[in-house]
Amino acid sequence: MSDMADAPASDERIKQTSALRKALIRPELGGICGTVIVFVLFAIFAGDSGMFNSQGILNWSIVSAQFMIIAVGACLLMIAGEFDLSVGSMIGFAGMMIAIFSITLGWPVWQAILVTFALCIAIGALNGIIVVRTGLPSFIVTLAFLFILRGFTIYLPQLIERKTIIGGIDKAAEGDWLAALFGGKILKGLFTWLGDAGIIAVFERGNRAGQPVVDGIPMLIVWALALVAFGHFVLTRTKFGNWIFASGGDAQAARYVGVPVNRVKILMFMFTAFCATVFATCQVMEFGSAGADRGLLKEFEAIIAVVIGGALLTGGYGSVIGAALGALIFGVVQQGLFFANVESSLFRVFLGVILLFAVVLNTYIRRMITGER
């Protein structure tokens, strides 16, 4: 007995994971490193160009928020093991529907927004139902909807208005309670005080002399932060979040333990459509118009942001915070190239390079996690 008690029990001990290894397998690692590198580079090459004053910060924050809104939906869907290539077309379609309902048909803007949300979420549900019922790859199904929605977005305004851009939404939205939730600003009083105190810049001449250059936080940014917080909470603090990981990691095993995989996937398609419609509504309220070309390539930008944030293309692994950091990188780089006087078309080159790098890094991380060689 004593010999057995004294025998080494190394085979019964739980293998400890080093702190370094834990850090390396965090999905946010790539996003964190990329964010630091991007900020350092632009601080060096564009630091004196106004990129980091109040107006410059607002500019790249708005662009980042746009990417962030659609990246949250794409992130949760990819973790669940699916893709949605119709996101960009959904943005254009949703914006056009708001314009047609409110301008052409004369509906109140709040009603046009609500009906558009219902319509787009229903289309997202249809995407999900087709995928789970037929077993077809979501890549193919949503690629089909990419063309269907874009086709309707071009055809309908031409049929009804004989043009592909419908304006006048800003005037129709004046005083509308729901439009203000997508196109207004918050904390205006705070920024007025900051301007009066000399903390932020104010206009020195013209009709706005004495007023702060930044007069509030756009609702676009508020929506982005709210969706990131919501997505992170659901993914990391709820049972449904565990279901999302399980559905993307091993759908068959998840079914065996009672996870409603099909329902999870359909709901994620619906949430992705919701995020795209939020983006479209904010965009329409900002510009006061809807255009048939809105949202082009946004589906790929959303996926790239998610991959930069550490999500695996195979599903079952990822982070909403990581996706948000990927979106932040996009916004900073897109605006930073302008401030650094670099040709803006190189932004597409950056997207391709960073996507390739992120996929290679994520593949290495997956092999570390699974022990593959």
State the predicted function of each range.
Residues 27-28, 138-140, 165-172, 216-223, ...:
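Loop-to-transmembrane alpha-helix initiation sites
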Residues 38-45, 53-105, 109, 129-136, ...:
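Single transmembrane alpha-helix segments in multi-pass membrane proteins
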Residues 31-44, 74, 147-154, 221-232, ...:
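Hydrophobic core segments of alpha-helical transmembrane domains in multi-pass membrane transport
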Residues 20-65, 281, 285-293:
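Helix-loop-helix hairpins and the membrane-proximal interhelical loops
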